[in-house]
Design a protein with these regions (language model features):
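Bacterial N-terminal signal peptides
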Residues: 8-17
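N-terminal active-site segment of His-dependent metallophosphoesterases
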Residues: 22-93
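Active-site-proximal beta-strand elements of phosphoester/diester hydrolases
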Residues: 34-47, 156-166, 208
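Acidic/histidine-rich helix-loop elements
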Residues: 38-56, 77-85, 111, 117, ...
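Divalent metal-coordination and catalytic microenvironments
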Residues: 42, 59, 71, 76, ...
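Active-site environment of divalent metal-dependent phosphoester hydrolases
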Residues: 46-48, 79-84, 103-114, 167-170, ...
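His/acidic metal-ligating clusters that form di-metal
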Residues: 67-69, 158-160, 173-262
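Extended active-site neighborhood of metal-dependent phosphoesterases/phosphodiesterases
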Residues: 88-200
Length: 263
């Protein structure tokens, strides 16, 4: 992903009817069934860079105006050394407000002086952090954020966060990595479990990851597609399609996906 100097075009505001995290880190609907998620992506923080400071100003402006209940960063927070400083600065607008937040890594985050696991460990105890991991599958930042009903008695919606990895490890395949089959199996199994516990009806769900799947480019090429916003480049998707979009369609729960990586 090319270096992005500002946050223009990388912000999504999602209004999906929920409320802030409690002291026990439980997300749930509130009485008026409103909740706001702000998505930040590709902050590309470089310590000492004026463009990074400008990005912080834009994030602060958004948070002050929107007053979100949850913030999700979809990758490429870190773009310079030391990674710990870059990551802290990229998260500071949220952490300073003690807002609930969740993170997934992009292809650039672990290119400096910390691994994905080290980055995850670094933010573990930050106030409001909901980022987690699932052992035994590819990637690091794969986890589920269930959203409870307003009375807290049942699951009412689900947020799926995927680690889309970084670059292809296959010599014959160039470019970016993809969400692996074991990650898709994890999603399907999780989705089936939530559906079964909901009496056979899929729970409304959203998915967040960094590198878009190939269907993003296919959708943009559809002459009947309604594209909102500014599209400065193609989706920079992986060359291999592992079927995540198809799995989501079959599960019937994902209402929308939110990614980063492109302008």
């Amino acid at each position: 992903m090319k270096k992005i100097k500002t946050l223009c075009g990388v912000l999504a505001l999602l209004c999906v009817g929920m409320m802030p995290v409690s002291a026990q880190n439980v997300l749930k609907f509130n009485a008026d069934k409103k909740f706001k998620i702000v998505q930040f992506t590709d902050v590309h923080w470089v310590p000492g860079d004026s463009a990074s400071e400008e990005a912080a100003e834009r994030m602060n402006e958004v948070l002050d105006v929107e007053k979100p209940d949850l913030v999700i960063y979809t990758g490429d927070l870190v773009f310079g050394k030391p990674a710990s400083e870059a990551l802290s600065k990229a998260l500071e607008p949220v952490v300073s407000r003690r807002l609930p937040f969740a993170v997934t890594w992009g292809n650039h985050d672990d290119e400096q002086d910390m691994t994905r696991i080290e980055l995850l460990e670094y933010i573990k105890d930050m106030p409001g952090n909901l980022t987690s991991t699932t052992a035994g599958i590819s990637g690091v930042t794969n986890y589920v954020l269930p959203l409870k009903s307003e009375d807290g008695k049942k699951d009412a919606a689900v947020l799926y966060v995927f680690d889309s990895n970084a670059y292809s490890s296959l010599k014959q395949v160039k470019g970016y990595d993809w969400i692996r089959p074991d990650q898709i199996n994890w999603y399907v199994e999780s989705s089936v479990g939530y559906t079964e516990r909901n009496g056979g009806k899929p729970l409304p769900s959203l998915a967040f990851f960094h590198i878009p799947f190939p269907e993003y480019n296919e959708a943009a090429q559809d002459e009947n597609a309604l594209l909102i916003g500014t599209r400065k480049e193609k989706a920079c998707a992986p060359l291999i399609n592992t079927g995540l979009y198809a799995a989501m369609l079959n599960a019937g729960d994902i209402m929308a996906t939110f990614v980063g990586h492109t302008m």
